[in-house]
Amino acid sequence: MRGILEAAIYVPRWRLETANISETWGQSTAKGIDEKAVPAADEDTLTMAIEAVERLFSNSTADRNDVDHVAVATTTPPLAESDLVAKLRTATGLPANVRTATLTQHTASGAEALATAIDRDGLSLVVCSDCPVGIPATTDHPLGAGAAAMLIGEDARTAVSSVGWYSLDAPGIRFRTADSVQSLGITNYERETIITAVTAAMENTTTDRSIDYAVLHQPNGTLPYRIARSVSIDTEKLTHGIVSRTIGDVGTATVAIGLLKALSEATTGEDTLAVFYGGGTAAAFNCTGSLNVSGLLDFDETESLTYATYLRQRGYLGTEQITGGGANVSLPTWQRSLDSRYRLVAGRCPLCDSISFPPDGACQTCHERVSFEHVPAEREGTIVAASVIGHGGAPPEFTTYQQRSGRYAAVIVELPVGDQSVRVPAQLTDIDTDEVAIEIGDTVRSTIRRIYEQEGVVRYGVKFTPNMKNRQTD
């Protein structure tokens, strides 16, 4: 039976406590949420999706070259019109001829992506990634960030035995006209509409109330309990799948992350119900089995933000737009070097067997112009040089990032390539340079982040994150 073969999650390490929101605004709309996950200044739905996918394959026996279908669900793509999946495919090294689908518009789009993968043949990759934004004084309070990646195929450890759907027109319940989530806030109407749709979707599956775990639509930490009581599900069965309490409302990814967390607690033969809702559509999935899920440590390895830092990091405070660029690279040149910028692909010289990075032009050892054999560098390396860039010290295209993140570190990282190595210049991310000392010899790991935006085009590429042992304060 088809189902989930492998899975991984990614949740940004930064957290904002609801108490800080209440202290600032005198109240909070984040009901039942203790804290929420906050994307770094250089993160968005694409970078989080990439990280979840890389975690999946780094702990999987599956070959990414066998994937023939990729579906990504989000309510907040980086651009209103662009192919998010094409960027994901390139960055993660999936086959160029893979069939792609981007699903958006509402928070149940993750259910559409999962159902499509279940219904088809072959090996499918489903990714739910979101970081919704709202009005800071009201609708933003519960909104978090995160991503889930699932590999779908035959003979799965977690079988999806039944899927049920229900839809109705639900005007005024969570909509977005431009850049931020809105709702008319008619609480009883919203709650009753959601419960009606969720109940009907459950009735359209073979699920009964004797399930072992339930993961229900959770835009906050209280609604899933109301839904459970209304459909006679023991609220104890929600325990492992309630993630909104600690990462917030993650749009289309909330239930997906909650489902994977619940499946990691389940044992063989146990049943887990997952119910998505969004825009008037509800979908219920009956899953049987357990799953090893990569990335669950993200729930524990966290760092707190002040509310002022949160507003700056999310871009809610005004940032200055700078023209020009001291480190500008033309788009054609950037495109030609994507394999190196995304996947750290180096080149082996056929004449002297030495490694060059990037694999372009003349060999950096024998200086002959050759056609390099492409070989990937390791994702983990060592800092051999570092410098902290303060305000006013960055090239113009990094000004907006620096305004949101504060001081940042530029490093040179030595990465193994077989029995040789290459040195790569890059930025460090997910580190407060005012609190954490950067030392030569520290180990770091590559990740994909936003590098800068120019003329409306976001340039993505490799940055490095420190290992946890390097996050010690002086």
Feature locations, PLM:
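Conserved beta-ketoacyl condensing-enzyme motif
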Residues: 45-105, 208-230
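Cys/His-rich short segments
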Residues: 323-382
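Glycine-rich active-site loops that engage anionic ligands at enzyme catalytic sites
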Residues: 380-432
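Claisen-condensing/thiolase-fold acyl-transfer catalytic domains that form or cleave C-C bonds
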Residues: 77, 97, 102-122, 140, ...
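Condensing-enzyme catalytic core mediating Claisen C-C bond formation in acyl metabolism
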Residues: 1-43, 140-192, 267, 277, ...
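OB-fold/S1-family single-stranded nucleic acid-binding modules
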Residues: 439, 447-474
